[in-house]
Amino acid sequence: MKVKICGLNPSRDVQLCIDLGVNFLGFVFYTKSPRNVSLQDIEILKTYNRLKSKFVAVTVNPGNEFIENIVQKHFDYIQLHGAETKKRVEEIKSMGLKIIKAIKIRNENDIDKYKEFESADIILFDTPGMEKSIEFPKNLISKLPKGDRFALAGSISQNNIENMKKLGVTFCDLSSNLETDAKIGYKDHQKIKRSIDKVNELKN
C-alpha cells in the first residue's frame, strides 16, 4: 500500500517521514488552512536527501508564476485541489509536472468525473471540503476504480487503514487524523509512526 501524508511542516516532520519510507509528502499552499506553509518555510526542502519519497505541492487553482517559481524548483508533484478544468490540468502537465488531481466525491454521480482528467498521473478521491476531516462513505469506496493511479483521502488513520485494504484501496492519503489533539495542523509523530507501522504490517 502506498501512503501520502498531507499538511506536513517542512522543518519538523520531513526527516521522520523520509526515514519511515512515506511515499508522498504533501505541503499545503492555501492561506485559509492551518497547515499552510510559506515560501520561507520550504527553503529547507532542498537540504533533504529524499531517497524514494516524493514531495508534493498541494494547491488550489495555482497560477503559472507560482508553478514556475516555486513548484518546479522544489517539488516532484503538484496536487490540484481546486476547480481546475481539463484544459487547465493539461496546461500544467505541459509545463513538465507530474499531477495529482483531487476529485471531491459527494455521491456516486461524482465518481466518473476522474475520466475527464486523463493527463493526471494520480487521481485522489476526497470528501467535500479541503480542510474537513470527513470519513469517506464505505458504500462508495467499493465503487471507486482501484490501482496505484487512484488514491483515497477522508479521515483515514491507523484505526481504519486495514479496512481500506480489505475494500481494495492500495493508496491512502492521511492528514488530520495524524495531528495532535491540542493543535490543528500540528502532526503527532507517534501517530505517524503507528500508522506507517500498520501499513508495513499489512504488507506482510
Please place each PLM-identified region on the residue numbering.
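Conserved N-terminal beta1-alpha1 strand-loop-helix module at the mouth
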Residues: 1-204
